[in-house]
């Protein structure tokens, strides 16, 4: 437990800082552009992380929203109830996960449709010999073809959105203070460590996507969708009255809103 508490203390000193929330979006954009430039001008040699079958990609990134949802659900519930003691407010705040799920579903559906309507089925990865009889990606793959369309990076979108959402929700830790005797201490400490590790995985795999996969325009659109999803909720909608609301803070709502304008 002592090692867990030390790890939690370290994460409180990094991910919970206001500067992290302010500059992480810019850091993601910069790393995406730098990684894409590196990929085009001086590609890195193949590595374990460039293999789509690597453990982090298969068991984490492929189900990134499920991991984020399942860890944020108890974290938001416990921390918000600890601070407010109001079940209604907790349920209201948990609706952020429903909003996030809707955003994930709508955006991935848009990406899939764009790839479908801009794509064609080819006989080889070199995009030779168009197979006009195959009208969908699924049908194309079933017949041994290769579908090529404008494939907006779902990884860039989802990893951006998930990382920023976790960092926003962890800002509540400025107000959460529990000692070892508190009934929620172990649960909250464990969730903080788990969410911190998850955030670092999302950022790492975002960098891998920038360096190894997709072209620049596909990653730009994916990252842009992630940033707009984050800012549209936490920066624009959630500070308003009729919304799931922001994580509880002792400071006024106006101060929270001002932090997005700096």
UniProtKB/Swiss-Prot annotation:
It is an enzyme of class 3 (hydrolase). Keywords: Deafness, Disease variant, Dystonia, Endoplasmic reticulum, Hydrolase, Intellectual disability, Lipid metabolism, Membrane, Transmembrane, Transmembrane helix. Widely expressed. It catalyses: an acyl-CoA + H2O = an acyl-4'-phosphopantetheine + adenosine 3',5'-bisphosphate + 2 H(+); (9Z)-octadecenoyl-CoA + H2O = S-(9Z-octadecenoyl)-4'-phosphopantetheine + adenosine 3',5'-bisphosphate + 2 H(+); (5Z,8Z,11Z,14Z)-eicosatetraenoyl-CoA + H2O = S-(5Z,8Z,11Z,14Z-eicosatetraenoyl)-4'-phosphopantetheine + adenosine 3',5'-bisphosphate + 2 H(+); hexadecanoyl-CoA + H2O = S-hexadecanoyl-4'-phosphopantetheine + adenosine 3',5'-bisphosphate + 2 H(+). Residues 1-23, 79-93, 167-190, 240-262 are cytoplasmic. It is found in: Endoplasmic reticulum membrane. It holds the Pfam family FIT. It comes from the Eukaryota. The active site is at residues 155, 214. GO terms for cellular component: endoplasmic reticulum membrane. Belongs to the FIT family. FIT2 subfamily. This is Acyl-coenzyme A diphosphatase FITM2. The gene is FITM2.
């Amino acid at each position: 437990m002592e090692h867990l508490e030390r790890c939690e203390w370290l994460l409180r000193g990094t991910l919970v800082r206001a500067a992290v929330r302010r500059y992480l979006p810019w850091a993601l954009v910069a790393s995406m552009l730098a990684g894409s430039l590196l990929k085009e001008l001086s590609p890195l040699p193949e590595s374990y992380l460039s293999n789509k079958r690597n453990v982090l990609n298969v068991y984490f990134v492929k189900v990134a929203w499920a991991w984020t949802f399942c860890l944020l659900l108890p974290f938001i519930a416990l921390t918000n109830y600890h601070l407010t003691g109001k079940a209604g407010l907790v349920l209201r705040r948990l609706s952020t996960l429903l909003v996030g799920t809707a955003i994930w579903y709508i955006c991935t559906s848009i990406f899939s449709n764009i790839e479908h309507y801009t794509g064609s089925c080819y006989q080889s990865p070199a995009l030779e010999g168009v197979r006009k009889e195959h009208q969908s990606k699924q049908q194309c793959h079933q017949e041994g073809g290769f579908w090529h369309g404008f494939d907006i990076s779902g990884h860039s979108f989802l990893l951006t959105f998930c990382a920023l959402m976790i960092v926003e929700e962890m800002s509540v830790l400025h107000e959460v203070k529990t000692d070892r005797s508190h009934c929620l201490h172990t649960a909250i400490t464990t969730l903080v460590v788990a969410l911190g590790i998850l955030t670092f995985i999302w950022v790492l795999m975002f960098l891998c996507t920038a360096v190894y996969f997709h072209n620049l325009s596909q990653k730009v659109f994916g990252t842009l969708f992630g940033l707009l999803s984050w800012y549209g909720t936490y920066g624009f909608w959630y500070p308003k009255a009729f919304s799931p609301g922001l994580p509880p803070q002792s400071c006024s709502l106006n101060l929270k809103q001002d932090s997005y304008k700096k």
